[in-house]
Swiss-Prot record:
Keyword Transferase: yes
HAMAP family in UniProt: BioF_aminotrans_2
Binding site for substrate: 26, 139, 359
Family: Belongs to the class-II pyridoxal-phosphate-dependent aminotransferase family. BioF subfamily.
Cofactors: pyridoxal 5'-phosphate
Name of the protein: 8-amino-7-oxononanoate synthase
Protein origin, superkingdom: Bacteria
Pathway membership: Cofactor biosynthesis; biotin biosynthesis
Record text on subunit structure and interactions: Homodimer.
Gene that this sequence comes from: bioF
Organism the protein comes from: Halorhodospira halophila (strain DSM 244 / SL1) (Ectothiorhodospira halophila (strain DSM 244 / SL1))
Gene Ontology molecular functions: 8-amino-7-oxononanoate synthase activity; pyridoxal phosphate binding
Gene3D superfamilies: Aspartate Aminotransferase, domain 1, Type I PLP-dependent aspartate aminotransferase-like (Major domain)
Catalytic activity: 6-carboxyhexanoyl-[ACP] + L-alanine + H(+) = (8S)-8-amino-7-oxononanoate + holo-[ACP] + CO2
């Protein structure tokens, strides 16, 4: 037991056992042969996937894959260095230019992940002790970013501009919010949040990971979808691994903002640049997403079908106002109930992950249904039937808010 690894394991084992006992233990299963809507499980059975983020079905589209293969042959499998050393390539510059144009901003900067992009933004713009207002349901990366920056978080009630205004004063530097909230699928009231921020001189930062490509004209995201002018959101964060089906993230804004991030954003400076071939694939995916509006139209039709069916069946699915997103949570309450529902759906060949604490508050465990443009009406109907069966077997104890 004197071995360092054994001592470390001895400290970790009780924590892992406690997590298993609480029904919160997590594990990953390798799925194969993903085609945008279905995949093959580890037991060899094909299942329909309703819990991914590939909203437009571009992860399995052959065109970004061809771009990736072509540029990998020309540029190799990796960048070989950080952007500011020798890792920056023409593919990165082309993608940044496309993203700036797509979002209506002067410039954009690539990051390896959305988590790193949020860390880079907040740690660059906030100094230790400065106040930052944040929605209480923000993504973990935004919450962690404020902590790591040494900022003083001022949380306001979810999507509540009035409470935000009460929490703000002229010492607050930033207001940070998700554009589309990843666990509830609702959209932030951006014009009202912007007005509250502007009243005290704070800058509004929007992480639109789940909105870009999906809602708004040409998939422009939550900013145009809510009627908010781009200049009222000085900092926009987006990801490339969700609606665009590839990998990576970016920040879009003024040239001055992007220059500042290039100088001081440690997650950008101290990491290897994304593979150039990956940037080429993302560029192709963004162009496809902008051009092929039928993907969003079909997706919206599926969302409407699911919401209508859930309402008719009495399923606990929230029906919030505002733009409709592919994230449709089915609220059940206890973690054990969510796990039982997920297992029943899995038995029927439908993969929907149970979302449990600490990802969501205690007592609000759910199945987070995510629809994609590759699903069919028949897929949605089969999902609704399975959810109704799961509800009969293990009734939910949490009613969905209206």
């Amino acid at each position: 037991m004197n071995h360092p690894a054994a001592r470390l394991d001895a400290r970790l084992a009780p924590r892992l056992a406690e997590r298993r006992q609480a029904g919160l233990y997590r594990c990953a299963e390798a799925l194969e042969d993903y085609d945008g809507a279905t995949a093959v499980r580890s037991d060899g059975q094909r299942c329909t996937v309703f819990c991914g983020n590939d909203y437009l079905g571009l992860a399995a589209d052959p065109r970004p894959a061809r771009a990736l293969a072509e540029h990998a042959r020309r540029q190799g499998s990796g960048a070989g260095a950080a952007h500011l050393v020798t890792g920056h390539r023409p593919e990165h510059e082309a993608l940044e230019a496309e993203l700036a144009a797509f979002t209506g901003r002067e410039a954009a900067l690539l990051f390896s992940t959305g988590y790193m992009a949020n860390l880079g933004v907040v740690t660059t713009l906030v100094r230790r002790g400065q106040a930052v207002a944040e929605d209480r349901l923000n993504h973990a990366s935004l919450i962690d970013a404020v902590r790591l920056a040494g900022g003083r978080p001022r949380r306001y009630r979810h999507a509540d501009p009035t409470h935000l205004a009460q929490r703000l004063d002229d010492r607050a530097q930033l207001v940070v919010t998700d554009g589309v909230f990843s666990m509830d699928g609702d959209v932030a009231p951006l014009p009202e949040l912007a007005a509250a921020a502007e009243a005290t001189g704070a800058a509004l930062v929007v992480d639109d990971a789940h909105g870009l490509g999906v809602i708004g004209p040409e998939g422009g995201g939550s900013v145009p979808a809510t009627g908010c002018a781009p200049e009222r959101v000085p900092v926009l964060v987006g990801t490339l691994g969700k609606a665009f089906g590839t990998f990576g993230a970016f920040v879009a804004g003024s040239r001055t903002l992007i220059d500042a991030l290039r100088q001081w954003a440690r997650p950008y400076i101290y990491t290897t640049a994304p593979p150039p071939a990956q940037a080429a694939a993302a560029l192709e995916a963004v162009r496809i997403a902008r051009a092929e509006g039928w993907r969003r139209e079909h997706l919206q039709a599926l969302i409407a079908r699911f919401r209508s069916g859930a309402r008719q069946l009495g399923l606990p699915v929230p029906q919030p106002a505002g733009p409709r997103t592919p994230i449709q949570p089915v609220l059940v309450g206890p973690s054990a109930t969510a796990t039982a529902w997920s297992a029943e759906l899995d038995r029927r060949g439908l993969r929907v992950a149970a979302i449990r604490p600490p990802t969501v508050p205690a007592g609000t465990a759910r199945l987070r249904v995510s629809l994609t443009a590759c699903h069919s009406e028949e897929d949605v109907d089969r999902l609704l039937e399975a959810l109704a069966a799961a509800a009969r077997q293990a009734p939910p104890t949490l009613e969905a808010p209206s």
